[in-house]
Amino acid sequence: MKIIEEETQVNQDNKYPWEKFDFTVMSYNILSQDLLEDNSHLYKHCQGHILTWNYRFPNILAEIKQLDADVLCLQEVQENQYGTQIKPSLEALGYHCEYKMRTGRKPDGCATCFKTSKFKLLSSNPVEFFRHNIPLLDRDNVGLVLLLQPRFYCKTTTAICVANTHLLYNPRRGDIKLTQLAMLLAEITNVAIREDGHFCPLVICGDFNSVPHSPLYNFLREGKLNYEGLAIGKVSGQERSPRGNRILTIPIWPRSLGISQDCVYEEQEKQREKEKEKEEIEEEIAKNSEEVIVVAKRLPTDLHHSFQLSSVYSHYFPESGIPEVTTCHSRSAVTVDYIFYSATKDSRTKESGAGYVFDGGLTLLGRLSLVSEQDLWAVNGLPNKTNSSDHLPLLAMFRLEE
């Protein structure tokens, strides 16, 4: 039985309970059956019968029932099984489900589901990373960005933005991964920003096919990346062979994509700049001119985004320093799955220049414990008799406060 471990000291004062809203979020790559069968060499360590969908689905559903998250961010959800089994089963548990299938002829996609007793849906925004007119973006990965309204909360205007994605696997194509991430961040900015220019709280989940402290991971956490001289095979930290040593081009993605170096839709960025200019007073003109010069001198290899994100997991066990693992099969045992969140209340971005403010903040109350590679191989790796994906579920409990 896995446990929720306490992450921080929580104020238990319930004098004003309407000022708090507690909820849980799960991120889980459930392993598409077609992808399992197409990559059977990864599961040679498994007994054949435990790899069938008829065996795996009851285990996956039992895990979801046991953890009972308020929001589910699922990846590798196979479309034919989603319609006939997964969606009906989750609806019977009180979830509303949104689904985005991968483009092309890919069999699976991302599903984000939420308890209707805890949230109502304000908007559902699918993101397709394929662009037929941009050779770089020839892969069929997708994302899904939901805006959810908490029930039983005093601020009727407060919403939570939940993003779910599964980035490209190929370890040697960090250029594609970074561009897919920029596209997701641009859509999150578009969905999460309010009329007053503030952001609502954010939770970003998924399989990012990148290891902790890789350049892609650090970009998400720190909000900035200078990619000058960076090899495409080093972006995600997965590639250990000499292959993938080609250096990232400058710029990574073409102007025709319509996304700036700040990972914002360019039209949205132009509008924001116009509104900012109208608000400036006469005595700040000189200062504004200086700031414009600084922006103009920004290196073309500088990427930024407008969020301050924390990771629910620390990725290493504090006592031993042994790495936590979120996926394990015959070829690999690493962390590639994450839950990121906006932890700081009314915090401004440090260096992007966006000047965004968050309304409210998320406090991490607890998380589901992960295990080490050694722990997993003690039960014959993944999938096994009780864990029926090659990934482990992540789970976090948050508190939304004024």
Label the model's feature ranges.
Residues 1-12, 182, 189-203, 208-402:
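Metal-dependent phosphoester-hydrolase catalytic domains
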Residues 35-36, 65, 69-72, 82, ...:
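Short amphipathic alpha-helices and their capping/turn residues within compact interaction modules
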Residues 31, 78, 168, 208-211:
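Catalytic metal-binding/acid-base residues of hydrolase active sites
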Residues 1-22, 71-169, 173, 244-246, ...:
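Structured beta-strand-rich core segments of catalytic domains in phosphoester-bond hydrolases
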Residues 38-42, 102, 124-127, 161, ...:
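Short coil/turn segments at secondary-structure boundaries
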Residues 143-150, 154-163, 177-205, 210:
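His/acidic metal-ligating clusters that form di-metal
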